[in-house]
Amino acid sequence: MELAQIVERLKKNEVVAYPTEAVFGLGCNPNSKSAVEKLLILKQRPVEKGLILVAHKLDLLLPFIDESRLKQSHWQLLTQQYDCPTTWVVPAKLSVPKFITGQFDSVAVRLCTHPAVAQLCEQTGFALTSTSANLSGLPPCKTAQQVRSQFGEFFPVLDMAVGNAVNPSEIRDIFSRQIFRRG
């Protein structure tokens, strides 16, 4: 599908697939409970796990982050470029719904450098949820065709290539720097 069609689907609170730095992600409007519920059902993902949010600029992630708990050094970590894509677990605002945070009082966020994410966020005006595009037990999709094979020929997928990263993003705690998933 073309970019404009994917943007329309996102604005209608539908779930789409889009390329990221290493694999295709399944995404939707994180402000829509119905969209996130569709995503969780499709992915067969428990709500307790929480979701990653991605955007091309920090402004779109700020509504989810409890800024009062972060120091300048944390902001530097969050905005710095890394050799591999890095998702940071940060304190969530109290207003962030549990369908985003899961069982946690934190939220996982990533500044994504992939042009598809930048274009989608720019045109929708919101961050995207990001969970790897794959059915339970299958490897994450690295091409639009793999997405169609797993989710059906008519699943809305942005037909662009993934980035050059080898693995999905590393996930780290902003305070302790603990690695939850290696990149």
UniProtKB/Swiss-Prot annotation:
It is found in: Cytoplasm. InterPro entries: DHBP_synth_RibB-like_a/b_dom (IPR017945), Sua5-like_dom (IPR006070), TC-AMP_synthase (IPR023535), TC-AMP_synthase_SUA5 (IPR050156). Its EC number is 2.7.7.87. GO terms for biological process: regulation of translational fidelity; tRNA threonylcarbamoyladenosine modification. It is an enzyme of class 2 (transferase). Required for the formation of a threonylcarbamoyl group on adenosine at position 37 (t(6)A37) in tRNAs that read codons beginning with adenine. Catalyzes the conversion of L-threonine, HCO(3)(-)/CO(2) and ATP to give threonylcarbamoyl-AMP (TC-AMP) as the acyladenylate intermediate, with the release of diphosphate. Belongs to the SUA5 family. TsaC subfamily. This is Threonylcarbamoyl-AMP synthase. It comes from Mannheimia succiniciproducens (strain KCTC 0769BP / MBEL55E).
